[in-house]
């Protein structure tokens, strides 16, 4: 109660944070490589898209991906968060072309829930 995977306000869909599967637990720069983080970002993005589909019924109703926030669980001196976040960006570009182009923040975190290596949030414009 009180939490939804995605919330629609008018034509804007806010997608809450999603993480990658259990095998992608740990910190970038320690247990997780950049390549593994890239794959984890793709999978976290797919988890977001599952909630998008549940909220609006059809992924073709996405008009524009507006914003992506990629939170990367990493060691303090890790500076390759954008390379990890590219996993999600590349997937959205592949799926939506120009409509997948988005503003993005890729930030390092000291920890994430359940030791997830990445958590992703999205904001999208959708149609009926």
Label every model-predicted segment.
Residues 1-128:
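Short, polar/acidic, helix-capping and beta-turn segments at strand->helix junctions
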